[in-house]
Amino acid sequence: MVHPVQVGKRTRMSFGKVKDVTEMPNLIEVQLDSYQWFLREGLHEVFDDINPITNFTGNLVLEFVDYKLDMDNIKYSVEECKERDATYAAPLKVSVRLQNNETGEIKEQEVFMGDFPLMTDQGTFIINGAERVIVSQLVRSPGVYYNYSIDKTGKKLYSATVIPNRGAWLEYETDSNDIIYVRIDKTRKLPITILARAMGFGSDQELLDFFGEDERFRASIEKDNTKTREEGLLEIYKRLRPGEPPTVDSAISLIDSLFFDAKRYDLSRVGRYKFNKKLALNLRIANQIAAMDVINPSTGEIMVEKGQKISRLLSEDIQNAGIKSVDILVDDKLVRVISNNFVDITKQVPFDVSDLQIKELVHYPTLKEILDNYSDEATIKEEIKKNLSRLIPKHIIKDDIFATISYELGLPYGIGYVDDIDHLGNRRLRSVGELLQNQFRIGLSRMERVVKERMTIQDQESITPQMLINIRPVAAAIKEFFGSSQLSQFMDQTNPLSELTHKRRLSALGPGGLSRERAGFEVRDVHHSHYGRMCPIETPEGPNIGLINSLATFARVNEYGFIETPYRIIDKENARATEEIRYFTADEEDQCLIAQAKEPLDENGYFVDKKVTVRYLEDVLVVPATDVDLMDVSARQIVSVATAMIPFLENDDASRALMGSNMQRQAVPLLKPQAPIVGTGIEFKAAVDSGVLPKAKNAGVVTFVSANEIRVKRDSDGGTDNYRLLKFKRSNQSSCINQRPIVNKGEIVFKNQVLADGPSTDLGEIALGKNIRMGFITWEGYNYEDAMLISEELVREDVFTSMHIEEYECEARDTKLGPEEITRDIPNVSEDALKDIDDRGIIRIGAEVRSGDILVGKVTPKGETELTAEERLLRAIFGEKAREVRDTSLRVPHGEAGIIVDIKVFTRENGDELNPGVNELVRCYIVQKRKISVGDKMAGRHGNKGVISRILPEEDMPFLPDGRPLQICLNPLGVPSRMNIGQVLEVHLGWAASKLGWHISTPVFDGATENEIEACLEKAGYNANGKTVLYDGRTGEPFDNPVTVGIMYILKLAHLVDDKIHARSTGPYSLVTQQPLGGKAQFGGQRFGEMEVWALEAYGAAHTLQEILTVKSDDVVGRVKTYEAIVKGENIPEPGVPESFKVLIKELQALCLDVKVLNENHQEVSLKEYTDDEIADLEVNIEGSEESTPVVPVVESNIEEVEVEAEDGYREDLDEIEYDENFEIETLETDLELDDFNDEH
């Protein structure tokens, strides 16, 4: 029954029946471990691959000896990097040796190879001040894949693909005449025997002797018109290099460079492992009947007699004895099975080789050669080290190619099996480390080219390693990866859960992955191998569904990049679950029968039932308890962290659970976080691992606590650890990051204890929303279509209030006409508008600002104009002072308001690093306190989302018999059709728990049952059906039927109405079409589209329609006159010719039609070609060019354009700004703001 469990500082009553046998791994270890591997081994591998670099004559040799990341010389700490827009990185120093073989001279030098971005403890990178996450990528593993298609006659045609990590592909295919073809590197197909001949079997007889008699092979030989090895080589050369004169030597070197050159063809460790696994004998000959005696080549003993069935264990011994091929009988047909001849080194070498660190199988002929030639242990070990690249080749070898052909020949007889490409045994993860390694390799190979060039050009006597090495390509490759790769993403920092999920995300998109358009249904679907590895629930809705996934809670990634999941080992004889835990990859698990975590066991671990329900591949079977191999370790093993936080997940429909998982990531951190009354027990682990909470580095005693810092006296040496807390910092998503201490002075803390709460955490548990008293009741139609009716109490008591911090920046640049200046002295601005501006021209902290207020006063020099006599006089009297400047101050944008919380000023004088051409940079932070309001989106944890339709006074809400009013009313119709019954159970259990004063943990798939919930309700003194009589707050009369009332955990989502509401009277227009821009960010208008025009046409509202199509859109002159008329209170004039009409005429002229426009009196109307001509006719100054001030505040086309279609539209302004490569178009748009309307208001 229910039992107390301690989570951090809180006790939860748990309904879980399965006791966890293993700890959940650290949830962000995917990121941390991968990056550590890269620093330890990944960099080494790249340097080893590139070593040595020689020049073309071979007398200069450059070698990378060693490298180190200089951790002591990190320029800025993580915090400083965020503040200064810097990159958190350490210098990479490499010691390089240059050897001159002619003179024997050796020079060694330490070379700086650029700053290398470092990962923070939270698993993120800080690039240009922004926190970024590198998402792991799911790709096809290198290896050999077999497949079949069925032709018209219903015959199976087998095909194969040999995929390396990088290099040429080999593809085999069979046609309906049983001829097997090969394609080399996507070229035209050749009969497979040509490839076999080129690899060394000249005559037909040799081929048949080696591969065995087989009609498909015979058919291929007949199709093949070459008869010797040389002819085969020439034939391949002709296909690969058409038009070049073929010679045998060039053909041999071509094949060598295509397949047998480690620089051009790389299998990678994974590829070699998958090749050996697929092509080994053991899995292919197990349970087959031997056609001949199988004899051990080294001892001469008979391992299997003719006609005997080969068991699984025997097949492994045969494999490791170094036997290359075995003949097998299938339906009285003799089939030869050829392996790639790799063996387990420990079975061949008589002594211990664990110190050589050989983890893969090794090539038997090479090993045999070493063992035959040497006898003593030390020499053999030395030789093995020397020949590692031959024992475990990185490229494909001939034996591999023969084995793949043999596998293809064996498939029709049922020897071997075809592969499922979507199986997680055939897909692997490229995590941060490997993605970085690939980029680094690209950079180094570019650098290698430069080094080789410089070796030939420069003087060989005086040359030094420093002179040869150009670090630019390396630094550029790394920078490009972090800055613009599809897998390097701006961290989703809405709340701790969204951070954690982002770091655990797996994407099948990105370079070398799939593309959205090409990905079919199969790739996106849930696969049985996902169990315990990838969450079947959490994936985005929309075009990326199934391509972006999330790692399951207990999953981890092994050294090859395959995802593993833990299982309990079952002692099969006794049908007893042991305490031993082992991690399995997807293909290892395929042979096993796996029991569920909930399967009842007695106290000694024996199965209670004789028959046990198990999983086997995609089936669910019931088998005797003695047949079970493994057992799940936990009920939440199959889901991701976000999904594991949904209580009663087992009672929700999958598509609603998907929405629930995704919406928890969008919950805004509230002012006063509150942990859920009904939780699942994973909240604490998720918050601790997400990295938003400060944890004690060492055990000790708290000596000092304030809002800003905590000091802990260490037990070990009596020293003090200081922990600074973050106060009101802005997150990537503009939510507020604030940490509050939860320990007291004098408290004893242990290592890794949580010291303070962060955003959306409560006593160290994730707290995304609030526990709300609600009922399922309709109220006057305000719950229609999922809308929510809420009580004013939620607004007044700040229940759903959140803080949002926006950042605005202003930079003073050098222009062609002189430098911009940040100053309080701004032309044409009243003293009242400057009341909160200090003498530097920057607003004071604590000032309350509204839209249009000045944040930073800035003036820009204006072009000198021809001076009039009066101006010359003024200039003579006042000197330089009357120089013309333009007001380009930073103002609060439309619809924004708040309080200034922080100002940061960076200047050249203070030694801050600024972009070229920038002299001063000011950042203002404005905080807003947003109460819940109509139009905000809220949601429960079960995918039950809705928009607030009305805020009702507390006294009008329905109330309980004890007088407490409800806080939210939800529509009962939202439940049955959506099948998310979990929300109802949550409400019942929450109702009971709030009365009993409990916090509850009900783990997914192992939570409270219906009977337990009823028992809790009765214990709390409520009706067992969970319903209550409710009274109408307006009349005081009871409603007709009892209503389900309880506590539901409700989140406020990041889709806030304040960010979406938007209105415009006039504003910027597009350069080309002269129509208003679109969207809130551009201060655009609402598009009146085709269908809306039809609606007005249908009503016959001609004048409204004319107005919308002309003066409200692109009639340039008409809209100015209309504005003027409105201001002066006159009648609105006739519309003119819209710009789009002129475009239409130009289109017709382009078709060589002469178009004239006539008015109603059949007189020709002259169209002005250019807007400038029309402006000349107006008395007003549209552009706001400063020579004469306009009579009325007139609005005209700004050059603030988002899709800048006209190239030259913004070129002139670009000249003023010194170009640099980090410059982004967003900053450009703010520079081009010439909007008189905004300036006036």
UniProtKB/Swiss-Prot annotation:
Record keywords, A-Z: DNA-directed RNA polymerase, Nucleotidyltransferase, Transcription, Transferase
InterPro entries attached to this UniProt entry: DNA-dir_RNA_pol_bsu_ext_1_sf, DNA-dir_RNA_pol_bsu_external_1, DNA-dir_RNA_pol_su2, DNA-dir_RNAP_su2_dom, DNA-dir_RNAP_su2_hyb_sf, RNA_pol_bsu_bac, RNA_pol_bsu_CS, RNA_pol_bsu_protrusion
UniProt record, GO biological process: DNA-templated transcription
A cellular component term, taken from the record's GO annotations: DNA-directed RNA polymerase complex
A single GO molecular function term of this UniProt record: DNA binding
Catalytic activity annotation: RNA(n) + a ribonucleoside 5'-triphosphate = RNA(n+1) + diphosphate
Domain of life, per lineage: Bacteria
Keyword Transcription: yes
Enzyme Commission number(s) of this protein: 2.7.7.6
Gene3D superfamilies per record: 2.40.50.100, 2.40.50.150, 3.90.1100.10, DNA-directed RNA polymerase, beta subunit, external 1 domain, DNA-directed RNA polymerase, subunit 2, domain 6, RNA polymerase alpha subunit dimerisation domain, RNA polymerase Rpb2, domain 2
The keyword Nucleotidyltransferase belongs to this UniProt entry's keyword annotation: yes
Functional summary from the UniProt entry: DNA-dependent RNA polymerase catalyzes the transcription of DNA into RNA using the four ribonucleoside triphosphates as substrates.
Family: Belongs to the RNA polymerase beta chain family.
Full protein name: DNA-directed RNA polymerase subunit beta
Organism: Clostridium botulinum (strain Alaska E43 / Type E3)
Lineage, top ranks: Bacteria, Bacillati, Bacillota, Clostridia, Eubacteriales
